Amino acid sequence: MSRINREEFARLMQQRVLVLDGAMGTCIQGYNLTPDDFLGGKGNNDILNLTSGDVIEAIHRAYVAAGADIIETNTFSGNAISQKDYGMENRVREINLKGAQIARKVADEAGRKVLVAGSMGPTSKSLSLSPDASDPGFRPYS
């Protein structure tokens, strides 16, 4: 396993620029995935860790082959608030664990030091912005 501590990470960053992978969601769009792959919740890319792990693994491998030093887990929306939109809030732990395992496997098999970073995006809810463009004053919370 290619785990490093904070000091080693700082040393690596002083030696050279570390390359982070690119957009997971954009790459996913290039695959012919069906609603079944998303368990009916098209757009829930994180659930693909469970249903189409081979696709996520292939994307990670492509980024490593392109020279990425750091790959991010496919867990951008892996939180209970965002997953509730798809009825998957009870699978958050499973989604995140599998996402980390897939990335870790690819990093370990890279033949060079590749780091894994956990990806944590915002939730699908906003207190400061209206989710409805036609009603900018609307807030889903009172």
Give residue ranges: language-model regions.
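Domain-level signal for soluble alpha/beta catalytic cores
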Residues: M1-S142
